[in-house]
């Protein structure tokens, strides 16, 4: 099972847990299920484990998972805020907008830490001047900058949620393109 398949399975487990658990802590429980399932799959499937490549693949997978989680949560938040503005939200008083913003901001921070660790560990394990790694490194750095700008924009510049959503969407696809293009170049 390859890297992208493991991440995809973990994200599917996140959505299953997030939808099926009907408590206020469902985000935390689903996130723990997704991240721990990825870590366990990785450690179970790869018998020869060396420290630096293992750290790199773990933090890279975790950064992708957290990127998907943050994108989903920010889209969900934007949808709920729009419903409140239009008067379509049934329990508008019970929906904590400020707490939801803080939660999304914390998720973005965790994702940025994982993406930064993935970049640092990637630079540490290999030279970036091989053909397949140039594409992966370039798009990961682009995603990191977009992610950082989104995080700074939300925290200090009061970006509207729609800009954060667009930034996360572009960042998510830049990271996915980096790994899919890398896989294509390796196997062809």
Labelled PLM ranges:
Residues 153-173:
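Interfacial loop-to-transmembrane junctions
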Residues 120-149:
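Short alpha-helical packing/oligomerization segments
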Residues 82-97:
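Juxtamembrane inter-helical linkers in multi-pass membrane proteins
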Residues 6-15, 60-81, 142-151:
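Hydrophobic cores of alpha-helical transmembrane segments in multi-pass inner/ER membrane proteins
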Residues 20, 43-51, 120-129, 184-186:
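Juxtamembrane "helix-exit" motif on the non-cytosolic side of transmembrane helices
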Residues 1-3, 49-60, 129-139, 163-167:
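Non-cytosolic membrane-interface motifs at loop->transmembrane helix junctions
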């Amino acid at each position: 099972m390859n890297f992208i398949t493991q991440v995809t399975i973990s994200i599917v487990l996140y959505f299953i847990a997030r939808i099926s658990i009907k408590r206020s802590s469902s985000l935390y429980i689903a996130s723990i299920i997704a991240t721990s399932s990825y870590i366990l799959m990785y450690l179970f499937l790869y018998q020869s484990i060396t420290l630096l490549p293992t750290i790199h693949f773990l933090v890279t997978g975790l950064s992708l998972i957290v990127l998907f989680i943050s994108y989903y949560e920010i889209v969900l938040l934007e949808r709920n805020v729009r419903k409140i503005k239009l008067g379509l939200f049934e329990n508008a008083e019970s929906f904590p907008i400020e707490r939801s913003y803080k939660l999304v901001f914390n998720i973005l921070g965790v994702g940025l830490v994982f993406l930064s660790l993935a970049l640092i560990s990637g630079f540490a394990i290999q030279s970036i001047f091989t053909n397949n790694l140039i594409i992966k490194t370039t798009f990961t750095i682009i995603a990191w900058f977009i992610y950082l700008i989104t995080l700074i924009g939300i925290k200090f510049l009061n970006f509207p949620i729609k800009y954060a959503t667009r930034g996360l969407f572009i960042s998510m696809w830049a990271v996915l393109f980096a790994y899919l293009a890398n896989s294509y170049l390796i196997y062809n």
